[in-house]
From Swiss-Prot:
Key word GTP-binding present: no
Alphabetical list of PROSITE patterns matching this protein: RIBOSOMAL_S8 (PS00053)
Pfam family, one: Ribosomal_S8
Keyword Flavoprotein carried by entry: no
GO MF terms held by the record: structural constituent of ribosome
Top-level division of the source organism's lineage: Eukaryota
One cellular component term from this protein's GO annotations in UniProt: cytosolic small ribosomal subunit
Organism in which the protein naturally occurs: Arabidopsis thaliana (Mouse-ear cress)
The family this protein is said to belong to: Belongs to the universal ribosomal protein uS8 family.
Keywords: Cytoplasm, Ribonucleoprotein, Ribosomal protein
Descriptive protein name: Small ribosomal subunit protein uS8z/uS8w
Swiss-Prot/TrEMBL GO biological process terms: translation
InterPro entries in the record: Ribosomal_uS8, Ribosomal_uS8_CS, Ribosomal_uS8_sf
Main location: cytoplasm
């Protein structure tokens, strides 16, 4: 199987496991971008704890699911988004303004759209979850 996007594979396996009612899922291979994305999801309570397992290859991540994740996905290609354009992207990708987050990679690190708006930085859209 050809891997186009490691982040896409990780989010899709989490989404599928969540829909099947699983309590945990193993993601491999791992990357720094996946770990940062998971930290943002964990900060907002959409997943539980996760653990990085070093197998001296590409690594694995075991994620505890808590049943809050409805949908998550990757936006490819990674479109440039200015601070003023974030609102349009939230309207396009998320079901409502009250919940859900868009994850951006910015010059100040990987963060959700609300934190990017507070820090007044734009960046590239990585993905979303709600």
């Amino acid at each position: 199987m050809v891997r186009i996007s490691v982040l896409n594979d990780a989010l899709k396996s989490m989404y599928n496991a969540e829909k099947r009612g699983k309590r945990q899922v193993m993601i491999r291979p791992s990357s720094k971008v996946i770990i940062k994305f998971l930290i943002v999801m964990q900060k907002h309570g959409y997943i539980g704890e996760f653990e990085y397992v070093d197998d001296h290859r590409s690594g694995k991540i075991v994620v505890e699911l808590n049943g809050r994740l409805n949908k998550c996905g990757v936006i490819s290609p990674r479109f440039d988004v200015g601070v003023k354009e974030i609102e349009g992207w939230t309207a396009r990708l998320l079901p409502s303004r009250q919940f859900g987050y868009i994850v951006l990679t910015t010059s100040a690190g990987i963060m959700d759209h609300e934190e990017a708006r507070r820090k007044n930085v734009g960046g590239k859209v990585l993905g979303f979850f709600y």
